[in-house]
Amino acid sequence: MKDSHQTIGVFVRPTHYQNPLFEELERAKEWVLKLLEDEGFESFMIDSLDGAQDERLIEKAYAFLCLGGDGTILGALRMTHSYNKPCFGVRIGNLGFLSAVELNGLKDFLQDLKQDRIKLEEHLALEGRIGKISFYAINEIVIAKKKALGVLDIKAYAGHTPFNTYKGDGLIIATPLGSTAYNLSAHGPIVHALSQSYILTPLCDFSLTQRPLVLGAEFCLNFCAHEDALVVIDGQATYDLKANQPLYIQKSPTTTKLLQKNSRDYFKVLKEKLLWGESPSKKR
């Protein structure tokens, strides 16, 4: 095992003690920490996803183990994005598009990691800016209404060129990795996770002619809403967007890095998670 592989940071899904998953996560956390020790890894816990961590520990880690569902992985990926470190998910929860393994497969995964038999996937991430505030998004950036009533007008530009005005509940700007998340629920297209593109999917648009749009990641985009709006990052963080204030979005210079098993195949994951080709009775 390479020396640089010896330290693993461990994220655990934040869970209230009254949550039904609390005891399961606590048991799993202790088991994972013991397994890492037995396999020769140093490890440290990361207590929250708010970024209030010791930078020296973050920089020391080779990778980050995320114990939970896709939400835990998304939070960890955003927090570690600027450090250019990979994450891998150990699924406990309902969703698992991003997870590398189930809990019972972690030992084999760690042994493969020690032998460099794990592949590194690099995905496009978004970098957004509102005024002096900048942020990263792994799955999507959503411009959403702040008020329950009415229609939100959003003007969209590629560079300095206006190309659309969306009128509805909002707009999703998704990454290919995030195309199977909120974007898919809003009837946006699935785009291969390793593609270099943005997916723009309107939310309940007032015009029946509006359709999702896929753009190459070489474009720098900006958006303005006609009234105060919310900008939602991966469904986990929000920022205020003032009326006519530009939101700038571009491809992040740093990729989202995920460790996966060599045997993982994206199309098999889609078929398994979305039940493609299954009969209606099996889907139920």
Curated annotation (Swiss-Prot):
Q: Which residues form a coiled coil?
A: none
Q: Which UniProt keywords apply?
A: ATP-binding, Cytoplasm, Kinase, NAD, NADP, Nucleotide-binding, Transferase
At the top of the EC hierarchy, this enzyme's class is transferase
Q: What is its EC number?
A: 2.7.1.23
Any single Gene Ontology cellular-component annotation:
cytoplasm
Q: Which gene encodes it?
A: nadK
Where is this protein localized, as stated in its record?
A: Cytoplasm
One function term, GO molecular function aspect:
NAD binding
Species source reads Helicobacter pylori (strain G27)
Query: Which superkingdom heads the taxonomic lineage of this protein's source?
Result: Bacteria
Q: Which Pfam families match?
A: NAD_kinase, NAD_kinase_C
Name the chemical reaction catalysed here: NAD(+) + ATP = ADP + NADP(+) + H(+)
The positions annotated for binding NAD(+) are 70-71, 139-140, 167, 169, 177, 180-185, 236
Q: Which PANTHER family does this UniProt record tie to the protein?
A: NAD KINASE (PTHR20275:SF0)
Q: Locate the active site.
A: 70 (proton acceptor)
Q: What does this protein do?
A: Involved in the regulation of the intracellular balance of NAD and NADP, and is a key enzyme in the biosynthesis of NADP. Catalyzes specifically the phosphorylation on 2'-hydroxyl of the adenosine moiety of NAD to yield NADP.
Q: What is this protein called?
A: NAD kinase
